[in-house]
Amino acid sequence: MSPSLSRRSALQAAGATVLAAGFTQLSATAARADEAAVVTPKLVTYPRPSAMPTNTSFKVRVRTAPDGEWQTLDIWRPQLGEINPTTGSSKTYNSSLAYFDFQGSVEVEVTCLKGGTTKVRVRPDSYGIKPEVGGDTLRFTLDQPRNVVVQINDDIFDCLHLFARAVEKKKPAQDDPNVLYYGPGVHTTADGTLLVPSGKTVYLDGGAVLKATVIFRNVEHAGIAGRGVLAGTAGGGALVENSRNISIGAVTVLNPNGYAVQLGEATGVTIKGLGSFSSKGWGDGIDVFCSSNVVIDGVFMRNSDDCIAIYTHRWEYYGDTSNVTVRNSTLWADVAHPINVGTHGNSDNPEVLKNLTFKNLDILDHREPQMGYQGCIALNPGDSNLIKNVKVDGVRVEDFRWGQLIHMRVMYNTKYNTSVGRGIQDVYVKDLSYTGKPLATCLLLGYDAKHAIKDVTFENLVVNGTVIADSMKKPTWYLTTDTIPMHANEHVLNLKFLTTAEAVAAS
C-alpha cells in the first residue's frame, strides 16, 4: 500500500473522512458526528462458496470508520449482456459484485488490479460520492445503505457492483419450524424448484447459494429473506402465482434462465432490497402480470431485458393490474427498457393498468437499437389495454447509450398484440431529470382519435440543466417539445409542461 493510504487524520466534526497527502479533498458522504455518538459501528461480511465463480479485476476492503480493522470482501461474478445491432448476436461479459452489511459509518477501499487507472466514477451520480484516488486504489465513506457501481476508465462491464446493505434486524433461528433455512454453501433441489407452503419463509443466509426457482403458488404469508444468492436457476429466480401477502427480501439473483421475479395474479407483494443481474435472452428483472398492491423498494436491477415490466393478461394470468409502486431503486437496462408498461393484455376482455407510481429512482443506462422498444420510461398499451393514473416523481436519468428518455405509444405491435391499446390517460411526471449527451427524439404517439393519449403533465422536467416549460424562453413559433426534443402527434391531447412554481400556483 502506498504511504498516502496508510495514514489518515481523525474524523472531522461532520464525520467526513480525510485521507493523507496524495489524495484530493474527500467529499464522499460520512456519518454525522451526532449519529456517530449513538450508533455502534458494525460490519458483517459474507463468504463466497469456492464452487461459485469469481472475478479478479478488483480487490475490495471495508472497515468501520474511523479506524476499524480492514476486512477483504469476496468477489462474485455476475454476467452481463450486450446485443450486436448488426448481427443480433449477444456478447457476454464477466463483471464483479461484492456485498456486506453495516451500521454506522464504513470506509470502502477498491483496488483495480488491472492497473492503468486514469478515471474513476462511483454511480449513481446523485449520491455525490467523490472518492479519494491514489494510483489504482480509491476510497470513499458510506454512512447509509447504498448500492453503487464503481467504474474505472468508463468501462461499464468490467466494473464493480457493491451492495452495502443495512444489518439485518432479526435473523431467524435455523430450527424455526416456519423457516426453510439454507446456510453458507451451494444448495440444489431434485427438480430445480422449491415450492414454498403458506406461512413459511425461505431464509438464505449470507454465503448461501440456492440453485432452484423459488415458487409461491396458491399460498399466503410466505417469503424469501436473508443475504444469500439465487444463482444459475433453470428458470427464473422467484415465481409468485395466485398468492397473497408475499415478501421477497435482500437476496441477489445471479444469471437466471428467466426473469429474476415473476408475479402473476398476486396481491400484497413486497420486494425490498433485491439485487439482480442477467445476461441471457428474456432476462427481465421484475415482471408483474395481473397483480395488485405491489411495492418494489430499494432494488438494484441490471438486466438483459426490461428491468421492470408491468402488464395485464399473458399466458394463464387474467385481470387488471393496479396499485404498483416502484421506489428508491436503481435500474440499468443493458437491453430494452428500465421501465416498460402495457404491452400484454386481453383483447377479448379488455383490462386496465392503473395507479402506478415510480418514485425516487436512478436510471443508470438504457441500450435498445429497436425504435419500437425504446424508452427509459415506456408506456405502451397494446391488446386493448388502458393505462391510467401514472405518477413519476423524482427520477434521475444518467447518460445512456441508445434509446429514448420517454416513450408513450398506444400501439398495435402485431408481433405481440392482437388489438390496439385503448389509450393512456392521466400521467403526471414530476422532477424527471436527464444529464448527458443530446437526447434522441422522444415519442408520444396516440394511435387515432379513439385510441389517444390524454392529460399528460410534466412538472419541472430538466434536460441538461434546462427546465422545460410552456412558459420558457424560446422562439414563439417553436413548440415546447422541440426543446427536449420530443414529438407528440395529433392524438396527444392536453399535454402540459410546467415549472414547479406554476404547478404549485395551479394546485
Predicted regions located by residue number:
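Short glycine/acidic-rich loop motifs that flank beta-strands on beta-rich extracellular proteins
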Residues: 190-192, 211-215, 232-237, 256-263, ...
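Extracellular beta-rich repeat passengers
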Residues: 368-507
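Low-complexity, Pro/Ser/Thr- and charge-rich linker/hinge segments at domain boundaries
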Residues: 164-186
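Beta-strand-enriched, solvent-exposed domains that form extended recognition/catalytic surfaces
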Residues: 37-172
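Right-handed parallel beta-helix
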Residues: 199-201, 206, 220-230, 244-255, ...
